[in-house]
Amino acid sequence: MDTIESYQAVIKQVINEYAKLRPSHGNIHLEPIFDDENSRYALMQFGWDRERRVRGNLIYVSIKNNKVFIEYDGIENGITQDLVQKGIPERDIVLAFLPEFQAVGGQ
């Protein structure tokens, strides 16, 4: 398995673990979305909480130039350590949602 395939497998495993969790209130569903062809991965939430519609992403990750770009991380403790613990080196993880990484990857 090459680096990209390995990273894809780890990202999907981590997102699937979070997708099994259930929010403590409301009728909210979590749905993983995987696009291996373009190396994009997301965990979406949708449903209702106290007559208010809930929708949006909790996690959005992409792989570019052999690096894992965490584009959005709405998980309380973050997913970085989960990715590292499952084998992705810290040096290959970019916290793309931070201003200092705006120019990384040309995005």
Give residue spans per PLM region.
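Terminal domain-initiation and capping elements
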Residues: 1-107
